Regions:
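The feature marks the mature, well-folded catalytic cores of soluble enzymes
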Residues: 1-252
Length: 252
């Protein structure tokens, strides 16, 4: 979290997007406090001011591995110790891969989207980093990745991909995925039509092509018809995904 919803740090360039209270209630609703299953760690204001509005721009994890920038957390030493205690309560030790400010400054970390990458577990064992091309083209970000690979730790491969279409739309690599680990029974309980497949992609594309305007100008934003068109599109998307009446206007 960034800070309390009821406080604004003095001299802050940007407001935090995650409030302590919101993060706390998420952990409560998911019953994560039992047995020390949750740790609330505050983002460093320096990272937020550098453009890391979401912490996945300066830290990324997979399994027991956390890769992070030295300036990602407020009171880093205390945050790391709290994390170690929580992991110890779950009978495992975290592997911490830290980029110091000397080897990679915050501007380089944010610009390269190094920590916005994905760490995946390989079927053959070990892990791989999937990164945007920007990380490869930023010399010190690339040097950090090379150092991680050379340590003979769990991350054994690095793959750089062209994700500039996503970057131009204002999102980094993390905007292309959201991973939720589920058991077989949990997966079976999900509305099957919410799982993306070829048929679902085609149906969603048809809604977009049929309902979305191909450009928006100031006059469009003042056009009452845009509201009706947007609601029609949302209603059709809800039908494609089998969501039912999830929006207020659908229940009128």
């Amino acid at each position: 979290y960034g800070h309390s919803a009821f406080a604004k740090p003095d001299g802050a360039r940007f407001m935090a997007r995650q409030a302590a209270e919101a993060s706390h209630i998420v952990a409560t609703q998911h019953q994560l406090w039992t047995g020390g299953g949750a740790v609330l760690i505050q983002q460093a204001q320096a990272a937020i001011d550098a453009g890391a509005f979401h912490n996945d721009v300066v830290a990324v994890s997979n399994g027991n591995v956390l890769m992070f920038h030295a300036q990602s957390f407020d009171q880093k030493e205390a945050a790391v110790e709290a994390l170690k205690r929580a992991c110890g309560a779950k009978d495992f030790e975290p592997i911490l891969l830290e980029a110091s400010s000397d080897e990679l400054n915050l501007d380089e970390a944010v610009r390269s989207y190094l920590f916005n990458s994905q760490i995946v577990s390989l079927p053959t064992g070990g892990m791989a980093l999937i990164l945007p091309r920007e990380a490869e083209e930023t010399p010190r970000a690339k040097a950090f990745v090379d150092r991680v690979l050379a340590t003979n730790g769990p991350i054994r491969e690095a793959h750089y991909l062209d994700l500039r279409l996503s970057m131009r739309d204002g999102g980094g690599p993390a905007g292309l995925r959201w991973r939720v680990v589920l058991t077989d029974s949990e997966l079976a309980a999900i509305n099957g039509r919410s799982i993306l497949d070829g048929a679902r992609v085609a149906a969603l594309e048809q809604v977009v092509n049929r309902r979305y305007r191909d450009r928006l100008g100031m006059a469009d934003l003042a056009d009452p018809a845009l509201l009706d068109e947007s609601r029609t599109a949302l209603d059709e998307i809800s039908q494609v995904l089998g969501l039912g009446a999830v929006h207020d206007f659908q229940r009128v």
